[in-house]
């Protein structure tokens, strides 16, 4: 289990702290792609996000039990 933390910056928005738990290790670019808005029909651009202070750490087995319940 991995704990992923970062600060999300979106155009026109205030920075937001973000945490996600994942069974697999994710890269910064994978997380940015996941969080960016999807393109819709009739919309000329998608909303991109930028992650700062990105960190992906493997949790110790004793800490995993706390988050899997």
From Swiss-Prot:
- Effect of disrupting the coding gene: Mutants show increased numbers of double-strand breaks. The single ralR and double ralR-ralA mutant have increased sensitivity to the antibiotic fosfomycin.
Q: Which gene encodes it?
A: rcbA
BP GO annotations: DNA metabolic process; response to antibiotic
Q: Which UniProt keywords apply?
A: Antibiotic resistance
Keyword Secreted (UniProt)? no
UniProt cross-references to InterPro entries, sorted A to Z:
DUF1187
List the signal peptide residues.
Answer: none
Query: Is Phosphoprotein found in the keyword set?
Result: no
Protein name per Swiss-Prot or TrEMBL: Double-strand break reduction protein
Q: What does this protein do?
A: Helps to maintain the integrity of the chromosome by lowering the steady-state level of double strand breaks. This region of DNA acts as an antitoxin to toxin RalR, a DNase, but it seems to be sRNA RalA that has the antitoxin activity and not this putative protein. Therefore the identity of this as a protein-coding gene has been cast into doubt.
């Amino acid at each position: 289990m991995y704990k992923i933390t970062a600060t999300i910056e979106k155009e026109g928005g205030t920075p937001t702290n973000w945490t996600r738990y994942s069974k697999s290790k994710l890269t910064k670019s994978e997380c940015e792609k996941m969080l960016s808005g999807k393109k819709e029909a009739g919309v000329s651009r998608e909303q991109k996000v930028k992650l700062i202070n990105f960190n992906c750490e493997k949790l110790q087995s004793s800490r995993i039990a706390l988050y899997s319940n």
